[in-house]
């Protein structure tokens, strides 16, 4: 089996980001993004998705975290697409429900080649520490556009915003793991009746 690894670098006037991933890893991760709460969430994706990740980012955090968070989503999406290659043999679809105390979220993903995001999370507050919860949408939109996936995110219940988004990221990691897994019965076969994704 060919290694499903990738390294992507993104350099703009706003951010400089390097992302290395191994889709068939063990969940080892290192993050230096300058946005601690995002690091915490990305760690959930790595651990629950069993994806090795190494992301280093320098952004215009003196303005705010918007560009950094969005561009990390973009770069991670590009890295996943690059590591995945032609998509032959993958399960393609993934889904997961994850609880954390009172919070429960569902994430469903399709490596369809058609970017689309449906994110429905009614946060109970606008900030988690110093992190603006609006930026989670920007992260996932960046990922979706560049990984070329359809992604449905629903927080079904929750009172604590930290718990709400942590269940989302854990479920995202587990849905990724399921969708990216190689199906031995589909070896070398495109998971689409069209013959292309």
Swiss-Prot record:
Pathway: Amino-acid biosynthesis; L-histidine biosynthesis; L-histidine from 5-phospho-alpha-D-ribose 1-diphosphate: step 6/9. Pfam families: IGPD (PF00475). It is found in: Cytoplasm. Belongs to the imidazoleglycerol-phosphate dehydratase family. One of its GO terms (molecular function) is imidazoleglycerol-phosphate dehydratase activity. Coiled coil: none annotated. This is Imidazoleglycerol-phosphate dehydratase. Signal peptide: none annotated. InterPro entries: IGPD_sf, ImidazoleglycerolP_deHydtase, ImidazoleglycerP_deHydtase_CS, Ribosomal_Su5_D2-typ_SF. It catalyses: D-erythro-1-(imidazol-4-yl)glycerol 3-phosphate = 3-(imidazol-4-yl)-2-oxopropyl phosphate + H2O. It comes from Hahella chejuensis (strain KCTC 2396).
């Amino acid at each position: 089996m060919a290694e499903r690894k990738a390294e992507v670098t993104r350099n703009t006037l706003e951010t400089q980001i390097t992302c290395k991933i191994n889709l068939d890893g063990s969940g080892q991760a290192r993050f230096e993004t300058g946005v601690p709460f995002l690091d915490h969430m990305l760690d959930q994706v790595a651990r629950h998705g069993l994806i090795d990740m190494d992301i280093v980012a320098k952004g215009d955090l003196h303005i705010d975290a918007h560009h950094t968070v969005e561009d990390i989503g973009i770069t991670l999406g590009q890295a996943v697409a690059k590591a995945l290659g032609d998509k032959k043999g993958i399960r393609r679809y993934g889904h997961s429900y994850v609880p954390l105390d009172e919070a429960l979220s569902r994430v469903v993903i399709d490596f369809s080649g058609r970017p689309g995001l449906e994110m429905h999370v009614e946060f109970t507050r606008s900030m988690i520490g110093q992190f603006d919860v609006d930026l989670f949408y920007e992260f996932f939109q960046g990922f979706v556009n560049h990984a070329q996936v359809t992604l449905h995110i629903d927080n079904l219940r929750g009172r604590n915003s930290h718990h709400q988004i942590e269940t989302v990221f854990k479920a995202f990691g587990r849905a990724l793991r399921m969708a990216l897994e190689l199906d031995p019965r589909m070896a070398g076969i495109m998971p689409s009746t069209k013959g292309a994704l």
